[in-house]
């Protein structure tokens, strides 16, 4: 059983890494969808992204990240942890 422990640990580490990658990908898709809806009112991609649209997307993503970080910090404090 001892020889299986390193294999199990390696497998669990790989599983955790893959789960994190999937969560990150899901968050990117969510941000893309929400910010697309906010910044592209006609739902069509422009032939060239202008400065106004680029700024809108940057601000949208930054606000979503800020909100996510705020929620994580708040939940951590509620659970007695420190952020």
Swiss-Prot record:
Single GO cellular component term: mitochondrial inner membrane
Membrane-topology annotation of the record: Peripheral membrane protein
Subcellular location as annotated: Mitochondrion inner membrane
Motif Twin CX3C motif in this chain: 35-60
Cysteines engaged in disulfide bonds, as pairs: 35-60, 39-56
InterPro entries named among the record's database cross-references: Tim10-like (IPR004217), Tim10-like_dom_sf (IPR035427)
Keywords of this entry: Chaperone, Disulfide bond, Membrane, Metal-binding, Mitochondrion, Mitochondrion inner membrane, Protein transport, Translocation, Transport, Zinc
Gene Ontology BP annotations: mitochondrion organization; protein transport
Domain of life the protein comes from: Eukaryota
GO molecular function: metal ion binding
Pfam family, one: zf-Tim10_DDP
Main location: mitochondrion
Comment on protein domains: The twin CX3C motif contains 4 conserved Cys residues that form 2 disulfide bonds in the mitochondrial intermembrane space. However, during the transit of ddp-1/tim-8 from cytoplasm into mitochondrion, the Cys residues probably coordinate zinc, thereby preventing folding and allowing its transfer across mitochondrial outer membrane.
Subunit structure, interactors included: Heterohexamer; composed of 3 copies of ddp-1/tim-8 and 3 copies of tin-13/tim-13, named soluble 70 kDa complex. Associates with the TIM22 complex, whose core is composed of tim-22.
UniProt record similarity statement: Belongs to the small Tim family.
Protein name, UniProt field: Mitochondrial import inner membrane translocase subunit Tim8
Gene that this polypeptide is encoded by: ddp-1
